[in-house]
């Protein structure tokens, strides 16, 4: 069974946070590879791959169907900030190989496990003039190649804050497909902030209109906020997207308590809201983002693990989009 077959059969459950669960391991400066690499989780692939393996295994242990590679910050743009841009291909290949090996250890004929090659937004957004579109697309190429060559079953372009950034990542993926004459599934996920749009002001309707024409397999939302603040935008996506839809919320909004970042959604409250997204809105893929622990995902698996996808009957509104708004093609 491949990933798209599984998506037709059940609500697919992705893993939770990599970063906050690595932080919970209380790694030393030496573990990170020195002060210059602190919080560069990709460098742990060289210094403490066992820590990455521990996080992956913790989510597979509770029943998640898909784990994401430890490559969210693995683009050439981000790695250049740590002085390791030349390792971009190797970092991403290692991340995918490690995840693929662990997923293989857990996979059975009755419960296959899959690896999603994670591609984050990076630190430079073209719409804000930080980087040109062409340079950003070029920076994604080595990441995409490494994730594919390492054995990723699908790509997930996630936490997208800028439609041009999203398109650059997707273009790099589809160029690889054309070059290699291959195809694996692609998910595109945008981040809607508490003020109701993407970081640069794009509303969810404009994001759907702009991204749906790409040959992606799933469109969705992740990060930014907890499930409460995602509800209206995700409902819109479920009611209007002809594609399968995904939602991977944070464990609420972060706040600092006693010098530590804390998220306010308990595993039980988080799972209840994710269950609502699947049963009532028709989410095809659920999972967690920042602050979500294996316990959060265990509760999600218990509530959602046996669900079949809900028929949504969504109908895409013919429209054009600017960087900010959707303009439907309607006549009076």
Protein language model regions, located:
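Domain-level signal for soluble alpha/beta catalytic cores
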Residues: 1-332
């Amino acid at each position: 069974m491949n990933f798209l077959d599984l998506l037709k059969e059940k609500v697919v459950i992705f893993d939770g946070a990599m970063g906050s669960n690595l932080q919970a391991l209380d790694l030393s400066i030496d573990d990170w590879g020195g002060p210059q690499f602190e919080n560069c989780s990709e460098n742990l692939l060289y210094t403490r791959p066992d820590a990455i393996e521990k996080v992956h295994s913790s989510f597979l242990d509770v029943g998640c169907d898909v784990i994401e590679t430890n490559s969210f910050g693995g683009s050439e743009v981000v790695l250049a900030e740590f002085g390791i841009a030349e390792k971009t291909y190797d970092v991403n290949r290692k991340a995918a190989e490690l995840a693929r090996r662990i997923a293989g250890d857990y996979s059975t004929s009755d419960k296959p496990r899959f690896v999603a090659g994670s591609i984050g937004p990076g630190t430079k957004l073209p719409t804000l003039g930080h980087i040109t579109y062409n340079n950003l697309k070029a920076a994604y190429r080595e990441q995409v190649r490494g994730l594919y060559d390492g054995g990723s079953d699908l790509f997930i372009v996630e936490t997208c804050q800028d439609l041009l950034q999203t398109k650059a990542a997707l273009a790099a993926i589809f160029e690889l497909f054309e070059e290699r004459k291959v195809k694996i599934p692609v998910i595109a996920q945008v981040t809607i902030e508490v003020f109701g749009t993407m970081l640069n002001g794009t509303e969810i309707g404009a994001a759907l209109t702009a991204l749906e024409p790409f040959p992606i397999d799933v469109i969705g939302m992740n990060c930014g906020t907890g499930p409460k603040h995602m509800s209206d935008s995700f409902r819109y996506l479920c009611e209007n997207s002809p594609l399968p839809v995904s939602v991977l919320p944070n464990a609420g909004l972060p706040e600092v308590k006693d010098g530590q970042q804390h998220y306010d959604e308990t595993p039980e409250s988080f799972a209840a809201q994710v269950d609502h997204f699947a049963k009532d809105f028709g989410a095809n893929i659920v999972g967690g983002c920042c602050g979500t622990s294996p316990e959060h995902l265990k509760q999600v698996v218990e509530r959602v693990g046996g669900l079949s996808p809900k028929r949504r009957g969504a109908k895409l509104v013919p429209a054009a989009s600017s960087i900010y708004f959707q303009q439907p093609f309607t006549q009076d």
